[in-house]
């Protein structure tokens, strides 16, 4: 065996292992004993035939072992094969079926994959890898997660309420757009609304807006604002349900030179103040002399109420608990429906409507009044000093009449049948403030009584006999 054959054997061992050493020796032995002198035409064919026989034996032992390339030259020299030799190689391999198969070209069931199937499988594997990479980047991408968390914080319902503000003292001409344009200098505004009357469509002088970032609220409240020629009053909006839970106080008699900041700082000594507001006149912008303070808890209210005297700028002020409007409405309803005929709703309704009198009582009273007025028209002039029997006022009518008059002539039921002192019996239907006897005071017969200053004759009302002027006297 020559030097080239030895080098061939060593290289073959490196590629295929020692187990095929015998096969290599047999193949090389056949090559030595061959008497055929290779020519340029059949040189490649013979080499391929030999390699095909050796490959057939190796395939029986291990069908998945890889074969060296077709251009491998056992003699160590590079051989250039013609197109005819390559065609013969393909025919020989197809006839003998001795070429080792590629393991990657078989599926899990051992069936060969076509080129189209293999391409599809590669595409599917690539798509799976792409999806996996995308999922991993979505799960591990810190930048994306942080941005999503920021967006969730900014748009969460809780933070949205924190960014809401009440804007008071608006000009009647201020619109939604002008209000939004002004406050967008402090941050992004999610929504903005000027409240309007549902009937007339006119502005009610206040509105609401919501910032995307709640921190903008503090910046807005730290400055004074002028919009459309008026000083506006922005406040942090407190939800209605939270207003009922918080401890709110009314403060009256606040000096006009007290600013809202001084007002807040003064009440901070009793507890943490959530909101402090001085009410302003919508037209003039001047303080109205009262305001409201909202504490964080009830203990601050108790501490404020425990002070015997509270003075601001040397002027005493009045402090008391603020009652929510809902509680005031409930109290009013209980007052209207809780004191009259709880067992009979119809009776209670009539009592409220007629000032404590049922329809039957009212009908009886008006019949007596008609009889009384008829007698007054038919009464002779000389009988002016004799009082005519008056109708008896039903029970409860006195209270009702006092409520209707509200500061008019005082009515005493015990003097109903005693007349007025002017020679004219008292008439319940006579309007308050009438010119009866020139009377304009509050207490008949009292020190404020004023008499008629007319002509001092028979028609003008003489001063004798204790009688004053009467319009029916002729």
From Swiss-Prot:
Annotated Low complexity bias: 425-434
Any one biological process term the GO annotation gives: co-transcriptional mRNA 3'-end processing, cleavage and polyadenylation pathway
SUPFAM superfamilies membership: RNA-binding domain, RBD (SSF54928)
Subcellular location: Nucleus
Residue ranges, annotated region (Disordered): 1-163, 412-474
Compositionally skewed regions (Basic and acidic residues) per UniProt: 12-25, 40-76
Keyword Repeat: yes
Main location: nucleus
Ranges of residues in domain RRM: 163-245, 247-324
Residue ranges with Acidic residues bias: 1-11
Pfam family, any one: RRM_1
Biased composition (Polar residues): 27-39, 129-140
An example Gene Ontology molecular-function term: mRNA 3'-UTR binding
InterPro entries: Hrp1_RRM1, Nucleotide-bd_a/b_plait_sf, RBD_domain_sf, RRM_dom
PANTHER family: RNA-BINDING (RRM_RBD_RNP MOTIFS) FAMILY PROTEIN, RNA-BINDING PROTEIN MUSASHI HOMOLOG RBP6
Name of protein: Uncharacterized RNA-binding protein C660.15
Native source organism of the sequence: Schizosaccharomyces pombe (strain 972 / ATCC 24843) (Fission yeast)
């Amino acid at each position: 065996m020559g030097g080239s054959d030895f080098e061939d054997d060593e290289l073959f061992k490196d590629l295929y292992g020692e187990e095929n050493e015998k096969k290599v020796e047999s193949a090389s032995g056949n090559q030595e004993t061959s008497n055929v002198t290779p020519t340029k035409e059949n040189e490649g064919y013979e080499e391929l035939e030999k390699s095909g026989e050796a490959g057939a034996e190796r395939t029986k032992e291990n069908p998945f072992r890889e074969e060296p390339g077709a251009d491998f030259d056992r003699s160590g020299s590079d051989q250039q094969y013609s197109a005819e030799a390559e065609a013969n190689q393909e025919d020989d391999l197809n006839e003998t079926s001795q070429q080792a198969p590629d393991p990657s070209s078989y599926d899990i069931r051992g069936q060969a994959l076509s080129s189209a199937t293999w391409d599809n499988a590669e595409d599917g594997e690539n798509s799976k890898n792409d999806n996996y990479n995308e999922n991993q980047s979505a799960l591990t991408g810190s930048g994306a997660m942080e941005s999503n968390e920021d967006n969730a914080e900014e748009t969460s319902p809780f933070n949205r309420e924190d960014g809401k503000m009440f804007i008071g003292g608006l000009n009647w001409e201020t619109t939604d757009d002008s209000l939004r344009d002004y406050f967008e200098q402090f941050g992004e505004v999610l929504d903005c609304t000027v409240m309007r009357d549902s009937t007339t469509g006119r502005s009610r002088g206040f509105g609401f807006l919501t910032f995307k970032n709640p921190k903008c609220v503090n910046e807005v409240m730290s400055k004074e604002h002028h919009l459309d020629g008026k000083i506006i009053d922005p406040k942090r909006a407190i939800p209605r349900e939270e207003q009922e839970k918080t401890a709110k106080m009314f403060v009256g008699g606040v000096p006009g030179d007290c600013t809202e900041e001084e007002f807040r700082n003064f009440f901070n000594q009793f507890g943490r103040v959530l909101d402090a507001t001085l009410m302003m006149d919508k037209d003039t912008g001047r303080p109205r002399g009262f305001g409201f303070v909202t504490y964080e808890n009830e203990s601050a209210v108790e501490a404020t109420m425990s002070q015997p005297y509270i003075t601001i700028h040397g002027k005493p002020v009045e402090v008391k608990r603020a009652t929510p409007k809902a509680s005031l409405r409930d109290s009013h309803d209980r007052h209207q429906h809780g004191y009259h005929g709880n067992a009979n709703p119809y009776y209670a309704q009539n009592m409220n409507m007629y000032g404590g009198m049922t329809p039957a009582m009212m009908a009886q009273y008006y019949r007596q009044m008609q009889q009384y007025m008829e007698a007054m028209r038919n009464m002779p002039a000389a009988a002016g000093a004799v009082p005519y029997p008056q109708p008896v006022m039903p029970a409860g009518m006195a209270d009702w009449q006092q409520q209707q008059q509200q500061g008019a002539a005082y009515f005493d039921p015990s003097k109903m049948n005693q007349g007025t002192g002017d020679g004219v019996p008292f008439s319940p239907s006579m309007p308050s403030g009438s010119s009866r006897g020139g009377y304009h005071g509050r207490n008949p017969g009292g020190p404020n009584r004023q008499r008629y200053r007319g002509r001092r004759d028979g028609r003008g009302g003489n001063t004798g006999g204790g009688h004053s002027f009467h319009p029916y006297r002729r």
